């Protein structure tokens, strides 16, 4: 009996196995319904595993992917491409040499350990950088594409793979901020106040500009920007129109009539209000704000309520207001807090700025009458008549076009106000103000600032920007990965010269980092306004032209070693340009060669041969402007 298996025992064993199998099938994650098609396909792929343990592990990992709708992760760790379709606009690729074993395309893991979408900060950066990604999807073995400068069809291509020059257009240019990157903080039918996105949100290389914000104010004729103060130091510049700006603290009040090219500093905490006193012309003001509380963030505080902003007086309790004004709360509410003040307001209406009726009380920019304009401008001083103004007062206005221009010829002008004892308004901020005017069809020669980082606002006209940067080669990488590694230096890593281009128009902003060469071409008369940061002891250095040419200062023997041509040829080439700083954008005729006829052919051959590799980084930088 011991050696025999009872039929009853055998039947019981079969029933037990069937029960276990049914239980396993019911508990399988594959039977679980999921609304995530990616996770569902993952569960289906797990059924291909022949081993039960591996299949269960696969299904367990698939359930975690249910929280990420963009998942393309294969939990079985297959190195080949999956059957899953990529989201629209994305391209799939197989594993490339150098890829990590833990596939980088898998969803990000949040702090809590669950799989989920990116956080708010990452989503904001991703939205900011939502541009075509074809460049960084290039396989690692492929060389950078040849460069054809934007808008120059028909010209000879330049920047071949051997020259290590790569071009980034406006869409991929982190130094360029088109006007659409402004967001409106206050706006109505009388005007608007817009703030540009934070520079450090665009790229980590702008960390030094974290505490600098650009603001644009636009107001229609005979309008007033209501009084307010802010937790930020401000420097405003009149771009267009005529304004009367009043600045007040607890003991003093000053009003100035400002015209185009005039600047004024408004210290943090000072009450200010801006009047467009012109009858027909709109007012445009550019302002740079430097917050004093939270880096990169500032707030406006209005004593009077409007549709866009409540009065900060409403934040105090009733007892505090009664004690502060030594009056009953009903009177305080009627005079300061309520818009409709009744008959008493009607009696004093002639002495008030405006009746503030519902018709014009639509925001922080209000319409004013001619009588109010005359009253507000009665005691204002002109910039040219400083008279009794105290010397060294940081609230004194600045005329950017006062005196002779720093640089000038028939093709353009440059005015600059530096941070020195003559300009205490800028000295403690270590800032400079620059005004550039480039004639139509002219070029501001390639140059760079030795120390200052300049934020440039396009005030008028159109043009083209070329900015040269030297970066670590970043092929086959996404924009976010490249940004995260911008501040990491690797010894022995390859460097490449990149040309960043942009088409400039009114309202755009671009950044000129220190030591980065820049050239600006004006397709129509172009006016630029620059706010320079870290401006003390800054020098503007040109790479071409008759004067202030740093390449001309390089010794002849060093030129022999650095450039394809000889030192004599380089010096002769430099002397071809008779103008300085601003020149015609049309290249001169190539009919006359700088070399003698006997040596023309061999010199060209030698130069073409050297152009393939170059002799140094200086040559690569110069090539980027071709």
Swiss-Prot record:
Q: Where is the composition biased (Low complexity)?
A: 587-596
State if Signal is listed as a keyword. Answer: yes
Q: Which residues form the Cupin type-1 domain?
A: 175-333, 398-571
Report the source organism: Arachis hypogaea (Peanut)
Record Gene3D superfamilies: Jelly Rolls
Quick check: keyword Glycoprotein in the entry? yes
InterPro entries linked:
Cupin_1 (IPR006045), RmlC-like_jellyroll (IPR014710), RmlC_Cupin_sf (IPR011051), Seed_Storage-Functional (IPR050253)
Q: Give the matching PANTHER family.
A: OS03G0336100 PROTEIN-RELATED (PTHR31189), VICILIN C72 (PTHR31189:SF41)
The family line of this record is: Belongs to the 7S seed storage protein family.
Biased composition, class Acidic residues, residue ranges: 482-491
Q: List the glycosylation sites.
A: 521
What is the name of the protein in this document?
A: Allergen Ara h 1, clone P41B
Per the UniProt record, the lineage of the source organism begins with: Eukaryota, Viridiplantae, Streptophyta, Embryophyta, Tracheophyta
One of its Pfam families is Cupin_1
């Amino acid at each position: 009996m011991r050696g025999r298996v009872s039929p009853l025992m055998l039947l019981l064993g079969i029933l037990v196995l069937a029960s276990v199998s049914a239980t396993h099938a019911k508990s399988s994650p594959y039977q679980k319904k999921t609304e995530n098609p990616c996770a569902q396909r993952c569960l289906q792929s797990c059924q291909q595993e022949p081993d039960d343990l591996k299949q269960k592990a696969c299904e367990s990992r698939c359930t975690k992917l249910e929280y990420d709708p963009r998942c393309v992760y294969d939990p079985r760790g297959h190195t080949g491409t999956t059957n899953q379709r990529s989201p629209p606009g994305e391209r799939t690729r197989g594993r490339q040499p150098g890829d990590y074993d833990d596939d980088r395309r898998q969803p990000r893991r949040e702090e809590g350990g669950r799989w989920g979408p990116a956080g708010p900060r990452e989503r904001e950066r991703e939205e900011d950088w939502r541009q075509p990604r074809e460049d960084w999807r290039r396989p690692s073995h492929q060389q950078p594409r040849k460069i054809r400068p934007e808008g120059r069809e028909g010209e000879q291509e330049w920047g071949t793979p051997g020259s290590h020059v790569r071009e980034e257009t406006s869409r991929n240019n982190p130094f360029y901020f088109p006007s659409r990157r402004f967001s409106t903080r206050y706006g109505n039918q009388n005007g608007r106040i817009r703030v540009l996105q934070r520079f450090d949100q665009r790229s980590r290389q702008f960390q030094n500009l974290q505490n600098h914000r650009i603001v644009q104010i636009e107001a229609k004729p005979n309008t007033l920007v209501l009084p307010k103060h802010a937790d930020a130091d401000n420097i405003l510049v009149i771009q267009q129109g005529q304004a009367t700006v009043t600045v007040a603290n607890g003991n003093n009040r000053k009003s100035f009539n400002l015209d185009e090219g005039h600047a004024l500093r408004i210290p943090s905490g000072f009450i200010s209000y801006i009047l467009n006193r012109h009858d027909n012309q709109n007012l445009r003001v550019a302002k740079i704000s430097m917050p004093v509380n939270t880096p990169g963030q500032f707030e406006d505080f209005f004593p009077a309520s409007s549709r866009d902003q409540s009065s900060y007086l409403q934040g105090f309790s009733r007892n505090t207001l009664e004690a502060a004004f030594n009056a009953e709360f009903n009177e305080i509410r009627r005079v300061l807090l309520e818009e409709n003040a009744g008959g008493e307001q009607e009696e004093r209406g002639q002495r008030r700025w405006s009746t503030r009726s519902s018709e014009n009380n639509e925001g922080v920019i209000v319409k004013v009458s001619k009588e109010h304009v005359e009253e507000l401008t009665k005691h204002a001083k002109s910039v040219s008549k400083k008279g009794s103004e105290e010397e060294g007062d940081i609230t004194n206005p600045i005329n950017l076009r006062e005196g002779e221009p720093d640089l000038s010829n028939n093709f353009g002008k440059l005015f600059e106000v530096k941070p020195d004892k003559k300009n205490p308004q800028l000295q403690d901020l270590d800032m400079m103000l620059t005004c550039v005017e480039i004639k139509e069809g002219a070029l501001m020669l390639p140059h760079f600032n030795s120390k200052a980082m300049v934020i440039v606002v396009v005030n008028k006209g159109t043009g083209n920007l070329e900015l040269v940067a030297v970066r670590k080669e970043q092929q086959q990488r996404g924009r976010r990965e490249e940004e995260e590694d911008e501040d990491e230096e690797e010894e022995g890593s390859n460097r490449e010269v990149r040309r960043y281009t942009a088409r400039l128009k009114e309202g755009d902003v671009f950044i000129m980092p220190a030591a980065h060469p820049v050239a600006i071409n004006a397709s129509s008369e172009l006016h630029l306004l620059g706010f320079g940061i870290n401006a003390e002891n800054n020098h503007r250095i040109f790479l071409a032209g008759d004067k202030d040419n740093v390449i001309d200062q390089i010794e002849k023997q060093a030129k022999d070693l650095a450039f394809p041509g000889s030192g004599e040829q380089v010096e002769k080439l430099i002397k071809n340009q008779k103008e300085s700083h601003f020149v015609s954008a049309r290249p001169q005729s190539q009919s006359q060669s700088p070399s003698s006829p006997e040596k023309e052919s061999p010199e060209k051959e030698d130069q073409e041969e050297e152009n393939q590799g170059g002799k140094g980084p200086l040559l690569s930088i110069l090539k980027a402007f071709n």
